[in-house]
Swiss-Prot record:
Residues 174-187 are annotated as: Extracellular Loop 2 (ECL2). The gene is Taar9. The chain crosses the membrane at residues 34-58, 69-90, 106-128, 149-170, 197-218, 257-280, 294-314. This is Trace amine-associated receptor 9. Changing W298 to F/Y: Increased activation in response to cadaverine- or spermidine-binding. CDD domains: 7tmA_TAAR6_8_9. InterPro entries: GPCR_Rhodpsn, GPCR_Rhodpsn_7TM, TAAR, TAAR_fam. The lineage of its organism: Eukaryota, Metazoa, Chordata, Craniata, Vertebrata. Spermidine binds at D112, T113. It comes from Mus musculus (Mouse). Olfactory receptor specific for trace amines, such as triethylamine, N,N-dimethylcyclohexylamine (DMCHA), beta-phenylethylamine (beta-PEA), cadaverine (CAD) and polyamines such as spermine and spermidine. Trace amine compounds are enriched in animal body fluids and act on trace amine-associated receptors (TAARs) to elicit both intraspecific and interspecific innate behaviors. Trace amine-binding causes a conformation change that triggers signaling via G(s)-class of G alpha proteins (GNAL or GNAS). One of its GO terms (cellular component) is plasma membrane. Specifically expressed in neurons of the olfactory epithelium.
């Protein structure tokens, strides 16, 4: 006979000998180990997967295209999520405590928001690039140049970093909800609730690029169907051997658009539940249970590990580049000029 008269287990605190310490939620050893394994794996995939993308695009000259420079910058944002955000969030999620100091808590929040929005803005720029490439493949090289790609990269980073640090590092996110912030504040916690004005701006910054991406990829899909029917209609007049240059280019660009469109869809699936919850929370006095919030946050984080897997699955040139990098053949003098793809596969 136990139950009702058994003494309750002592309450655990993040810092046992500190007044005002946060309460610590403990897991049993096996669930704790599994959580560390699953969340840690996400961080490792984000770091090493995106590092492979960056090395491949910067090293191999065949991959020096405006689109791929955008992809490399996108991979850089995801790589930084894996380095500066995910390891610390892993400890916070499993231990339910923040052990890395108040100063890095602010930086962690700023990095988190900056790099995630940088990913979104890069994907929006890539959708514009793919739209031009598919709808006008012959003049595309003169319209979306390396300079234009560089401008898109610079603006994506500037707006995401400016937005993040102007809100969280200055404390502007706490205006009007000071009582809630005081109630949530404890030693060993790292929370950054957004007031209604800032969460609305956050939603708009997510919603507007998303609308642009969905519209452009919808247009790309329609154009691709039209081009496919046109090519099929002319197949009897000219066999595959006489396929025009324009048709080969269009086929290559459609394939690249499809792969990057899948990356965009994965991003939206990962992000949409979190954004919807953030908006609802701000207007419903932050009612989301902690474990639900953690799941939504990690869906966003895991997106940083997904893009390299998508590239590896759809791009033969990326798989070949990985083999060359891992085997150390990239250190050969002429490795940067290696032919990574056949003519029909395209450069992505």
């Amino acid at each position: 006979m136990t139950s009702d008269f058994s003494p309750e287990p002592p309450m655990e605190l993040c810092y046992e000998n500190v007044n005002g310490s946060c309460i610590k939620s403990s897991y049993a050893p096996w669930p704790r180990a599994i959580l560390y394994g699953v969340l840690g794996l996400g961080a490792l995939l984000a770091v090493f997967g995106n590092l492979l993308v960056i090395i491949a695009i910067l090293h191999f000259k065949q991959l020096h295209t405006p689109t791929n420079f955008l992809v490399a910058s996108l991979a850089c944002a995801d790589f930084l999520v894996g380095v500066t955000v995910m390891p610390f969030s892993t400890v916070r999620s499993v231990e339910s405590c923040w052990y890395f100091g108040e100063s890095y808590c602010k930086f962690h929040t700023c990095f988190d928001t900056s790099f995630c929005f940088a990913s979104l803005f890069h994907l929006c720029c890539i959708s514009i690039d793919r739209y031009i490439a598919v709808t006008d493949p012959l003049t595309y090289p003169t319209k979306f140049t390396v300079s234009v790609s560089g401008l898109c990269i610079a603006l994506s980073w500037f707006f995401s970093v400016t937005y993040s640090f102007s809100i969280f590092y200055t404390g502007a996110n706490e205006e009007g909800i000071e009582e809630l912030v005081v109630a949530l504040t404890c030693v060993g916690g790292c929370q950054a609730p957004l007031n209604q004005n800032w969460v609305l701006l956050c939603f708009l910054l997510f919603f507007l690029p998303t609308v642009v991406m969905v519209f452009l990829y919808g247009r790309i899909f329609l154009v691709a169907k039209y081009q496919a029917r046109k090519i099929e209609g002319t197949a009897n007049q000219a066999q595959a051997s006489s396929e025009s240059y324009k048709e080969r280019v269009a086929k290559r660009e459609r394939k690249a658009a499809k792969t990057l469109g899948i990356a965009m869809a994965a991003f939206l699936v990962s992000w949409l539940p979190y954004i919807i919850d953030a908006v609802i929370d701000a207007y419903m006095n932050f009612i989301t249970p902690a474990y639900v919030y953690e799941i939504l946050v990690w869906c966003v984080y895991y997106n940083s590990a997904m893009n390299p897997l998508i590239y590896a699955f759809f791009y033969p040139w990326f798989r070949k580049a990985i083999k060359l990098i891992v085997s150390g053949k990239v250190f050969r003098a002429d490795s940067s000029t290696t032919n990574l793809f056949s003519e029909e596969a395209g450069a992505g």
